[in-house]
Amino acid sequence: MDTQVEMLLDNILVACPQKIFAKKIKQIKKKHSFKSKDTMQSIRELCSLLYIMDQEELALQVANLIDKLEYKGDMRIWMNVNGVLTVESLIYAKRGENEKVKICRKTIEDVYLYYGDEDRQRVNMKVFKRVMNGEGFYLEEIKRAQDSGDLKLEIFWRFLQFEELLYMRAMGDSEAYPIEKLDSMIEEEKQFIAMHIDKASF
């Protein structure tokens, strides 16, 4: 593993000593390969968790590990690149760095909307519209976890909901979910996960 990467991960443990951060860092160190779906997923999750804990600079540094990787046809790998781009986009939007926001969005669009032939692009656009209308939410899963009193499971589903909302926010908004509503929903999930971060174990 690159020395700078190792230093970054060690710095994260100092800033965020909670078990979930130690777990993600251990996963990254165990098999540090950008061709590994598991490594990429752990990097994406670590980036999102850092944003949740208001560690924006560290989140950007983690995102920078993979945000320049090109799409090679494996969506299981690239969905994690997409994930860190959405975190970057939100941070840059808060800072008023609009050109960087545009770059993040274009990178996502080039793969999710405009990659492949016309038939694939049509399918991609249909899926995109469903996502932007909230059809990818995890509200039922969250409710079931609440009803069963399973806090750890609720945190997990809320984390996935949080990442879904970040994607929608990075891609703009829709009639059903304008920017103001998305920002409010993102903040709600962010606060809940941060409050219960010691119980997170996914």
Task: Locate each region found by the language model.
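N-terminal alpha-helical interaction modules that lie
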Residues: 1-41, 45-46, 51, 149, ...
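"A position-specific structural signal for the A-helix of alpha-solenoid helical repeats
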Residues: 6, 10, 45, 80-87, ...
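Helix-turn-helix repeat elements of alpha-solenoid scaffolds
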Residues: 12-26, 52-65, 99-106, 131-139, ...
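Flexible helix-coil transition and linker loops at the boundaries of alpha-helical arrays
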Residues: 29-37, 68-78, 113-120, 146-152
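Short coil/turn linking the two alpha-helices of tandem helical-hairpin repeats
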Residues: 74, 96, 116, 130, ...
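TPR/TPR-like (Sel1-like) alpha-helical repeat modules
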Residues: 102-114, 166, 180-194
